[in-house]
Amino acid sequence: MLNIKWIRENQELFDEKLSQRFIEPMSSKIAMLDEEKRKITSLIQEFQHARRVKSKILGNMTSKSSEEFEGLQRDVKHINEKLEELEKDLNNNNELNELLNMLPNIPDDEVPYGIDESMNKLVRTYGEINPNALNKQHFELGTKLNLMDFEQTTKISGARFVTLKGDLAKLERALINFMIDVHTKEFDFFEISPPVLVRDNAMYNAGQLPKFTEESFATTKGYRLIPTAEVSLVNIVADTIISREKLPMRYVAYTQCFRSEAGSSGRDTRGMIRLHQFGKVELVSITTPEESQNEHEYITNASETILQKLNLPYRIMLLCTGDMGFAAKKTYDIEVWLPGQKQYREIASCSNCGDFQARRMKARYKEFGSNDTTLVHTLNASGLPIGRTMVAILESYQNEDGSITIPDVLINYMGGLQKITTYSE
């Protein structure tokens, strides 16, 4: 959620930042609604003060039957009636919060202006692309190996699901353990095993609700399946005050993730690129405003290190204002090269959300010896999605006979296996 005080004091800049997100000016409307709310709040405080004063006088009066006593009683009764009306007005005046809840984060000054991904800015590339590489797509390879099943899975669950078997299932498990080891041992992230069913308020805190209600799966019991472990991880600090010396707090988790893929009809209908259910290793950092920019580079480096160790070519793009996520103020996308598609495809998003999520979930920190609190900054990064990483490995390490060479760093995790070959039932 955005800072209403900042909006009030920077109305022109606020409208300019909204325009970069292709949203019409809102400062005048927000200022008007805010003024109404503040007036009601001020009146409530005045009546509460008057009630305290009159109640204290009543409590000190010795004669309970005097005309003055009865007059004060009538005054207190009238005040209570007015307070009830005002508090009802305040509770019914939800338009301001509803409006703020639908507004995205303010773009950082470094974020380029642009309407879509075509205007993202290249930051750097890694690795050499082999123009003569074999170019079968992952679903062709996996199906031929008899280790990737879409047809039977569709009968079980419908479209956008997959069943991995044998050595591909083992590769999935190897990737999870490899990624967790890198992030915990080399980058000091603390491993978490969080729930994948969360309440609506946890989704709201992370910026998923109310804007993206249709993009997640809701259960009949008031829970939602997480679209990313970011939801569970950032909520670890919800409604808390953290000691400054404990920051940064860095969390890593592997979970299954669930997305309805609303609006993705016709996109990536074949293969493992866009599924309703997929495994992902997620990174979350909680830090101070002063350190969030450095932490953004740190968490991005943690993500790209996985691709470097797997020797997979990639590039990093700074997302433009029109392509950036709802809760982010600045985002790097890591795009891995897929020989089968002959193009870069997104494999990770690394975002600095500033205090946007923290304001929603009331996550603060304070310096030692001080009573003053400040909102933390939250950051998140994919570290990485298992399915898309497997896609890149299958396409980049394929051989003429359809077998897949295991990347060196994964051989021990695969129990010494160096090549995946066709499975014969």
Swiss-Prot record:
Cellular localization per UniProt: Cytoplasm
PROSITE patterns: AA_TRNA_LIGASE_II
Enzyme Commission code: 6.1.1.11
Pathway it works in: Aminoacyl-tRNA biosynthesis; selenocysteinyl-tRNA(Sec) biosynthesis; L-seryl-tRNA(Sec) from L-serine and tRNA(Sec): step 1/1
Reactions listed under catalytic activity: tRNA(Ser) + L-serine + ATP = L-seryl-tRNA(Ser) + AMP + diphosphate + H(+); tRNA(Sec) + L-serine + ATP = L-seryl-tRNA(Sec) + AMP + diphosphate + H(+)
Binding site for ATP: R259, S260, E261, E346, I347, A348, S349
Gene Ontology molecular functions: ATP binding; serine-tRNA ligase activity
GO biological process, one term: seryl-tRNA aminoacylation
GO cellular component: cytoplasm
Keyword Amino-acid biosynthesis annotated: no
Binding, L-serine: T228, A229, E230, E282, S382
Keywords: Aminoacyl-tRNA synthetase, ATP-binding, Cytoplasm, Ligase, Nucleotide-binding, Protein biosynthesis
PANTHER family from the UniProt entry: SERINE--TRNA LIGASE, SERYL-TRNA SYNTHETASE
Domain notes: Consists of two distinct domains, a catalytic core and a N-terminal extension that is involved in tRNA binding.
Function: Catalyzes the attachment of serine to tRNA(Ser). Is also able to aminoacylate tRNA(Sec) with serine, to form the misacylated tRNA L-seryl-tRNA(Sec), which will be further converted into selenocysteinyl-tRNA(Sec).
Protein family (similarity comment): Belongs to the class-II aminoacyl-tRNA synthetase family. Type-1 seryl-tRNA synthetase subfamily.
Subunit architecture: Homodimer. The tRNA molecule binds across the dimer.
Protein name: Serine--tRNA ligase
Organism listed in the record: Rickettsia canadensis (strain McKiel)
